[in-house]
A protein has these predicted regions:
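Mid-domain alpha/beta scaffold segments of enzyme catalytic cores
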Residues: 1-119, 123-131, 143-151, 158
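Mid-to-C-terminal alpha-helical segments outside catalytic/metal-binding sites
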Residues: 208-246
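Short acidic/histidine-rich active-site segments
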Residues: 188-204, 224
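Short helix-capping segments at alpha-helix termini
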Residues: 39-41, 134-139, 185-187, 216-222
């Protein structure tokens, strides 16, 4: 499939974890076990560390989890803080988002941001962009806002941040729909596409399928290479830990 590396953000487990120790073990899995497992298949494995927005409603608990994150940011395969963001756009989620942005700034980390799904996406994206723009210390070039769709992609790119189009067979964005977005809004230098294995119907080969769709729509090989390889590498190489070459 042409995959060169795997980048895995800290994510919801399908259920809310009940202890800080549960998060500690999960972070160990991301930073110790998964790189070894991927290496058996000759794939470099990188990760992002955070408490995700679906588990950020309990402020006391979330802050206890945040306290253990800095030691994992030092791991050689951790690229930054993510995916932080919003789920239901609640006051508590905003508070934990802001505290994890501060954590990233304190440790000079890249930031990966999750935007809400369905009817909350536009409101949540606007709120996230406003929060980021209010802090002059934030370098937009070091922030990727993921899961953009037709009604949010322009907002993210025009604000100077990186935008991620997440590919799924049913939810989020199918490869043909993603290419529709590229034809409508252009293939920005701050845009990439990513696929993943989620809790719903997923296809980790969505990105190779998107490449086929791009070729069918007469995108040049240079444009395709920029979207699916050069752009991600440019963003990720801002972390000195990311070792793939352009």
């Amino acid at each position: 499939a042409g995959c060169k590396a795997v980048c895995e953000p800290a994510f919801w487990a399908g259920f809310d974890r009940s202890s800080v120790a549960g998060f500690y073990d999960y972070y160990r899995q991301l930073t110790e076990y998964e790189p070894k497992r991927a290496a058996r298949y000759y794939l470099p494995h990188y990760s992002w560390i955070c408490i995700n927005p679906k588990e950020a409603e309990d402020l006391v608990f979330a802050r206890e989890v945040i306290q253990i994150i800095p030691k994992f940011l030092e791991k050689e395969t951790v690229l930054g803080v993510g995916e932080i963001g919003l789920n239901k756009n609640s006051k508590n989620e905003v508070a934990i988002l802001e505290e994890q942005i501060q954590l990233a700034l304190d440790h000079d980390q890249l930031i990966l941001i999750h935007t809400p799904h369905l009817e909350d996406k536009l409101k949540g994206t606007k709120l996230i962009v406003d929060i980021l723009q209010q802090d002059p210390r934030i370098n937009p070039n070091k922030v990727l806002i993921d899961h953009v769709e037709e009604h949010t992609i322009r907002k993210v790119i025009e604000a100077g941040f990186w935008a991620g189009i997440t590919l799924y067979p049913e939810s989020k964005c199918t490869p043909p729909r993603a290419v529709d977005m590229l034809e409508q809004y252009g293939s920005s230098n701050r845009l990439w596409m990513n696929s993943a294995c989620d809790w719903g119907v997923s296809d980790p080969l969505s990105l190779p399928k998107a490449i086929l769709e791009l070729r069918k729509r007469s995108f040049s090989e240079e444009e395709i290479d920029r979207l699916v390889y050069q752009n991600p590498v440019h963003f990720l190489k801002q972390s000195p830990k990311f070792k793939l070459d352009i």
